[in-house]
Amino acid sequence: MLVVTTENIPGKKYEVLGEVFGVTTQSKNFVRNIGAGLKNIVGGEIKDYTKMLHEARMVAIERMKQEATEKGADAIVMMRFDSGSILQDMQSVVAYGTAVKFIED
């Protein structure tokens, strides 16, 4: 499944099938919270959180692709991410875009 952040795919014509999205919510565990608290004191990147957010994005993309496949799409255009905190220890990530089907010339 081709996924692009642009509106057009050079050399391709397509019909729009509709919006697709994938979402995941991940929680921070106790050990990560302790490590993050220490990093907050001394400064620097909190690698466990960075890894968690990267993994969450990958899960959201895969779920979005699955929804597009179920709609019969060949690609997703205008893909974007959104994320936010839920309560204090949870992070939600959504990947969304427009599912399209290629038109043969």
Swiss-Prot record:
User: Which Pfam family is an annotated match for this chain, by its short name?
Assistant: YbjQ_1
Q: Which domain of life is it from?
A: Bacteria
What cystine pairs are annotated?
A: none
Similarity field: Belongs to the UPF0145 family.
Q: What is this protein called?
A: UPF0145 protein LSL_1614
